[in-house]
């Protein structure tokens, strides 16, 4: 019985033997089996033959190789663009008509056929467009035909140098008109430039004056927005920042002069305080100027009215960030509330002071945060412990004494305790936290 399929040769690689290219793309079986069964294609070669035989160049055997389809597509360039390419590609930036034909046919195979049609279009575009200038041939060079070149003003007729996009049809009269307009504007510009130069110093001076950094006579006081919650202990500076009269300063802020005079007992330290504070611009201020609020504002009934604030932590942090170490002992004092404990002061101002002191709890006595300052400021630490013991005794005395007053929002100020206020059994002691 004869085999239906051809048996391949016993080669070490087990591939189909080489089939010559003249047998076509397909070949039928050699036996008497199914004659229509396709056999392996000729693209498979024998191991001993070269990897890519010459017969593979022809895809369909006896047929001639077809031209690539992309060469038969018309280029997306206009005839003006093609002529411009040919002129710019030449060495002298000028070319004959025959040179234009040769350039187009070499670069674009599409124009190798139907030469009569597109060559006629090339001649029409050379004659009708003003961007192409005809240059007579020099007698020294042999040949016939004139040269064609580009008008010097037409080099920018294509957008960004792309031959696919042309701005507009080049016309010589439009170019002349544009030149006249530019010349006219150039004559008018010097007068405008002089006027602008004459007005420019005035504008710059006005801008500098508005910014507040122009002339030396102006006050260089920083604006209120830069220091919203701190102010200098000087009464005149505090009144200027808060916008209140100088007579109201002792009622709206702590009076550091009276505190330092009362505790130190020497007016010299009180006189040196404003000067020493001026040397530390970035320090935390010990005086608070509350923002003015309506007179009918009152704290809630359950709000504690008695508090003990020790601002020594503030002074220590101030000394850590300050510039002078000799002025630090001036700040190691407890805050005296005598100015706000006056019996005739309104409850709204007292509540404002209470809220201002509540806003900065992290400055107050915290042993964990002040531990790293003990080595640098031993004198301040000793004074701090002494003041704390004094506050402890006052707190114990307040807790043991009977409470005077009612449950209303009115605050009572006992005459025996001029430095502290108490309206209930609850005592808010900042020094123990």
From Swiss-Prot:
Checking InterPro entries in the record gives: Fork_head_dom, FOX_domain-containing, FOXC1/C2-like_FH, TF_fork_head_CS_1, TF_fork_head_CS_2, WH-like_DNA-bd_sf, WH_DNA-bd_sf
Name the residue ranges with Basic and acidic residues bias.
174-187
**In which compartments does the protein localize?**
Nucleus
Which keywords accompany this UniProt record? DNA-binding, Nucleus, Transcription, Transcription regulation
Q: Note down the stretches annotated as region Disordered.
A: 174-250, 318-355
Q: Which Pfam families match?
A: Forkhead
Q: Which residues bind DNA?
A: 74-168
What are the coiled-coil residue ranges?
A: none
Q: Where is the composition biased (Low complexity)?
A: 338-355
One cellular component term (GO) for this entry is:
nucleus
SMART domains listed in its UniProt record? FH
Compositional bias per record (Polar residues), positions renumbered to this chain: 239-250
Instruction: Read off the CDD domains from this record.
Output: FH_FOXC1 (cd20044)
Role summary: DNA-binding transcriptional factor that plays a role in a broad range of cellular and developmental processes such as eye, bones, cardiovascular, kidney and skin development. Acts either as a transcriptional activator or repressor. Binds to the consensus binding site 5'-[G/C][A/T]AAA[T/C]AA[A/C]-3' in promoter of target genes. Upon DNA-binding, promotes DNA bending. Required for cell viability and resistance to oxidative stress in the eye. Promotes cell growth inhibition by stopping the cell cycle in the G1 phase through TGFB1-mediated signals.
Its name, as the record gives it, is: Forkhead box C1-B
Name of the coding gene: foxc1b
